[in-house]
């Protein structure tokens, strides 16, 4: 395909392939052992049990040890569960605490909306005030502090509504080339909006190719790729609407390619009388190299923000206080 030829040409121009050992063919055992020992030394000197990019949530990091290099992480949920808010909280923590660039492909929302969400979360400013410009006198110091925190941070947002895997790799290479060949994290919102241009394949086959391309992206840049994903609406017919692996839309390839799959679930979306108002569950349904389990977080909707240490129950006043 012409796109593949262009993709390979750009790789050669940027000399990316020379830096990626996985592109160089079979490697003998001795250098692999040396690399493994170097990695063990690196991990031994790391802070606590965190060996990847931290999420900002202690209980979640205890299960994952952070988002690992070369991993494809899926964050899935039904509409209104807070997938984008959660992803942007991960972006916020990464750009404020790590030096490597973070690249966000926002196929659903314009970049302005994402910046509003970041400012709302960091400054604890009601997002409605930001969207309408109706900030109070007390809000402005928080706004200025949030804007200052983000200024000059290595965050890049691509909000073009349609992108192919080839285009995504090309744009990632350009950012990496400007930062010593490195990326700290890539976020895709969301997977099902990606397209392979010119394909005549059915949608399941196309999603399979997209899923595989995201895993290849993680491998090429040796960074975590966090991709948001839709879930089948059929789960809403069940009494217990907590997602399971089979609920992933066009799930076969996604389930196979992902190293870690998380589901976002908030019971209050379905049950007005739930005792778990303001509580979100981050359900790890697949973890190729670690445990699965559920982490409870608090959800502050007005700030588009998830926070750690949700107690067993919240009263309704918490989310409005």
Enumerate the predicted regions with their spans.
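Short, small/acidic-rich helices and loops at N termini and domain boundaries
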Residues: 1-46, 50, 76, 81, ...
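Amphipathic alpha-helical transducer elements in NTP-driven molecular machines
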Residues: 3, 54-57, 111-115, 137-147, ...
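Pre-Walker A adenine-sensing motif
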Residues: 57-66
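Cytosolic-facing regulatory segments adjacent to core modules
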Residues: 62, 93-182, 196, 295, ...
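P-loop NTPase nucleotide-binding module
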Residues: 66-109, 169-178, 184-187, 198, ...
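C-terminal regions of RecA-like/P-loop NTPase motor modules
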Residues: 166, 170-183, 212-221, 233-321
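Structural recognition of the conserved hydrophobic beta-strand(s) that form the central parallel beta-sheet
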Residues: 187, 224-229
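Walker B catalytic acidic pair
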Residues: 190
């Amino acid at each position: 395909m012409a796109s593949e030829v262009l993709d390979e040409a750009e790789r050669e121009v940027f000399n990316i392939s020379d830096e990626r050992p996985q592109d160089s063919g079979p490697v003998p055992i001795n250098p692999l052992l040396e690399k493994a020992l170097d990695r063990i030394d690196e991990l031994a000197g790391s802070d606590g049990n965190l060996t990847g990019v931290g999420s900002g949530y202690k209980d979640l990091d205890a299960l994952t040890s952070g988002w690992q290099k070369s991993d494809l992480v899926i964050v899935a949920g039904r509409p209104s569960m807070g997938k984008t808010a959660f992803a942007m909280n991960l972006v916020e923590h990464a750009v404020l605490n790590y030096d490597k660039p973070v690249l966000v492909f926002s196929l659903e929302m314009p970049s302005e909306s994402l910046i509003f969400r970041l400012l709302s979360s960091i400054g604890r400013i009601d997002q409605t005030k930001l969207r309408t410009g109706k900030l109070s006198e007390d809000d402005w110091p928080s706004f200025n502090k949030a804007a200052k925190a983000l200024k000059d941070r290595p965050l890049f947002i691509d909000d073009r509504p349609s992108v192919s895997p080839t285009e995504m790799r090309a744009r990632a290479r350009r950012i990496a080339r400007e930062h010593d060949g490195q990326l700290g994290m890539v976020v895709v919102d969301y997977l099902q909006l990606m397209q392979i241009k010119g394909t005549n394949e059915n949608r399941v086959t196309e999603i399979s190719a997209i899923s595989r391309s995201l895993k290849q992206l993680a491998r090429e840049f040796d960074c975590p790729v966090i991709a948001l994903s839709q879930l089948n609406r059929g789960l809403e017919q069940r009494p217990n609407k907590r997602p399971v692996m089979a609920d992933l839309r066009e799930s076969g390839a996604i389930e196979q390619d992902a190293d870690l799959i998380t589901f976002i679930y908030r019971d209050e979306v379905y049950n007005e009388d739930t005792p778990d108002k303001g509580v979100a569950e981050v359900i790890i349904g697949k973890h190729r190299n670690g445990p699965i389990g559920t982490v409870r977080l608090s959800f502050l909707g007005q700030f588009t923000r998830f926070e750690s240490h949700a107690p067993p129950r919240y009263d309704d006043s918490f989310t409005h206080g």
